[in-house]
Amino acid sequence: MDGVKANQRQQLQLLLVAARHQLSRSDLRSMIQFLENEDCGFNVTLQMADPSEQPELLELHRLVATPALIKLSPTPKQVFAGSSIFQQLQNWITRWQQDIVVTGLGLSLRPTELDGSRTQRELQLEDQLLVLRQENETLIDRLNAQERTLRMVAHELRTPLTAAVLALQSQQLGQINIEHFQDVVKRRLDEIELLSKDLLEVKSTKWEDLFNPQNLDLGNIAAEAILELEKLWLDRNIEIRTDIPSDLPKVFADQRRMRQVLLNLLENALKFTEDGGEVSLTMLHRTSHWVQVSICDNGPGIPEDEQERIFLDRVRLPQTSVSTSGFGVGLSVCRRIVEVHGGKIWVVSEPDKGACFYLTVPVWQRNGQE
């Protein structure tokens, strides 16, 4: 039997509540493609809403976190959340299809008639258990998000403090005047104040909501980062080579976070480069949608079996020499920042031939991001 004909299909109305950056998740993209292209036995209507634009949806549907998929029709309403939304939907579609077949045959929809070996009470308990699992996944996701936010902000605090210390050392050596020193310290204190506000918002704000993407000149951000670390490379006679095209398009990114990524990668490159060595920073407009950044050094390199691990949380590689302390948690923060922007970050390295870190940043699109 072919089941219910297309013109007799029941409407399946779904609402996906997700922020723009969350829609770049591979599982959500796969789910949307599945609902648009696959024959799942329903006439599917999928609506999408951004919680930042429609915050009332969170209260209306009692959503603890996003992304969340809500089945509005047919009733009863169901909410899918956590890291396995697509898998949950696929599992439930099978049960909904069974309901359609039974209805088409004019039979009762009592669960006991779908599966004689299981009582209606057992199925109700199974549904309740599924809801509890979903809520547990959502709470775990929220706790993990808060932990990531704390780690990111704590790591970011190092940047203005380091810059202030370097400015103090330069002023004491007579390399900058008192006015320049005061200007640097004031700007760094302003940064620390902003970071302290982020810390206060951790409990009420998702990590991703601390990002404020805008039309940004990434070349200028890189130049500022190089200048900020000037003392680190000048004192060690390290040459920094840059290749940034004059026609490089603007990117759509958060200024503070992109600056943090470039500072961290440059600082690592300088740390692993011997005195008199070379560090390069290159930007390329590879496609109409992405700018690719590469930061390379001629240090000791990174073992192949460690090249994935260095981007994981809480991973710190052993020191490679007496003068270096190894890669710290900064790279995991960099990875999360880049991924929130929809980009990717990776490393290419061989022992004793240095390392090149690559990342992609989305190009600012005039029509879609104004």
Curated annotation (Swiss-Prot):
Domain of life: Bacteria
Catalytic reaction annotation: ATP + protein L-histidine = ADP + protein N-phospho-L-histidine
InterPro entries hit by this protein: HATPase_C_sf, His_kinase_dom, HisK_dim/P_dom, HisK_dim/P_sf, KaiB_domain, Kinase_SasA, Sensor_HK_Regulatory, Sig_transdc_His_kin-like_C
Keywords attached to this entry: ATP-binding, Biological rhythms, Kinase, Nucleotide-binding, Phosphoprotein, Transferase, Two-component regulatory system
Enzyme's top EC category: transferase
Residues modified to Phosphohistidine: 155
Functional summary from the UniProt entry: Member of the two-component regulatory system SasA/RpaA involved in genome-wide circadian gene expression. One of several clock output pathways. Participates in the Kai clock protein complex, the main circadian regulator in cyanobacteria, via its interaction with KaiC. KaiC enhances the autophosphorylation activity of SasA, which then transfers its phosphate group to RpaA to activate it. In addition to its output function, recruits fold-shifted KaiB (KaiB(fs)) to KaiC to cooperatively form the KaiB(6):KaiC(6) complex (independent of SasA kinase activity).
Protein name (Swiss-Prot/TrEMBL): Adaptive-response sensory kinase SasA
Organism for this UniProt entry: Prochlorococcus marinus (strain MIT 9313)
